[in-house]
Amino acid sequence: MNTFQTLIYEKKDSIAYITLNRPKALNVYNIQMRDELYQVLGAVRDDPDVAVAILKGAGDKAFCAGADLTEFLTAPSPIIARQVRWERDVWGLFLSLPQPVIAALHGYVLGDGIEMALCCDIRIASSDAQFGAPEVGLGIIPAAGGTQTLPRMVGRSKALEMLLTGRRLNAQEAYKAGLVNRVVPREELLPTTEEIARKIASYSKMVVRITKQATIRGLDLTLNEGLELEKRLETLNQVQGF
């Protein structure tokens, strides 16, 4: 049952659906959405029945057009704002989820929207999607992980061009840059995303989780260290009988 104001959370079989639900405001990320996402992501993480999650935006115009700066820049004090952010580390929670997360991206994918998408494991874009990081032009830095996740996806030069100039990429440019996995017509966005989710959900949950863990953790290791990690995780998989 959905009891949130800025999100819709549903489970169908073993697939979790998280929908950013502020369509009149282009699904911009505000304080309430942060708190509700923190709660929902924790529920997904702790639910053994969830094999994969889909993240999408409500409405026709945007996945997420950024953050609501009127809220985040008017906190009672910078100290309180930082403390609350540390206590509700939504981005860290995204990155630590054991289940794969697939982002279905349409319309505006800007600011916190692109940073949220970059925390997902697979990104499917509709042909009308636009990607950008306008924060520098607003006098702030992309502090929701954009300076770290974007260059890891598209490389240093392309990331700096986007971050320092605010240049937007259309869907095909994003695909060529490696920012998204596929580009599909708008009407095929959710069906394509669900097809991928169902494929993943058809496999052993443990094997999927271990494969994700080995891949992501291995990126920060040397090749030899990564191979050792892979062996340890495969042994764990065999011991548990999967």
Residue ranges and their predicted role:
Residues M1-A16, D47-P48, D60, G166-Q172, ...:
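C-terminal alpha-helix plus adjacent terminal tail
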Residues M1-K56, G92:
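Conserved CoA-thioester-binding segment of acyl-CoA-metabolizing enzymes
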Residues I15-T19, I54-K56, P76, I102-A104, ...:
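Structural motif
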Residues I18, R22, L37, L55, ...:
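Terminal peptide-recognition signature
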Residues M33-E36, Q83-W86, M116, L189, ...:
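Hydrophobic alpha-helical membrane-association signature
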Residues R34, L69, E87, W91, ...:
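A general structural signal for well-ordered alpha-helical segments in protein cores
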Residues G57-L93, V109, G139, T222:
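Glycine- (often His-adjacent) and acidic-residue-rich active-site loop
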Residues G92-M206:
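Crotonase-fold acyl-CoA enzyme core
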